[in-house]
Swiss-Prot record:
Gene3D superfamilies: High mobility group box domain. GO terms for biological process: chromatin organization. Binds preferentially double-stranded DNA. This is High mobility group B protein 4. GO terms for molecular function: chromatin binding; DNA binding; DNA-binding transcription factor activity; structural constituent of chromatin. It comes from Arabidopsis thaliana. The modification Phosphoserine is found at S123, S130. Residues 126-138 have a biased composition (Acidic residues). Induction: Up-regulated by cold stress. The gene is HMGB4.
Amino acid sequence: MKGGESKAEATSTDQRLKTRGRKAGKKTKKDPNQPKRPPSAFFVFLEDFRKEFNLANPNNKSVATVGKAAGARWKAMTDEDKAPYVAKAESRKTEYIKNVQQYNLKLASGTNREEDDSDKSKSEVDEAVSEEEAEDDD
């Protein structure tokens, strides 16, 4: 073993690392209706820069090259040059905050019918429906 560790010490370290992290496959699913976070000023700049860069370099397929060139230009820009991108990012941020508030109100009011059924498994819902149909036939 490396570093003078015994085999028992190595396995106990592995066990500690396994128990600390989250279990694989237990990710919580994100709501597709949840508003996306707004881009920062740099990413607003990057949207415009990509268009210019792709027109100037149509054969470039490397995302890294575009990112490096954009980063270099962003660092070279003055605060006055960055101001329109910062303003646009701020406006998107305020719009995002409004959207999140509306989204949270919608969740709190419980207008989402899908959430009401999510507590029951599909088989429980199907059984309840079939029992209701059987009662209606009588």
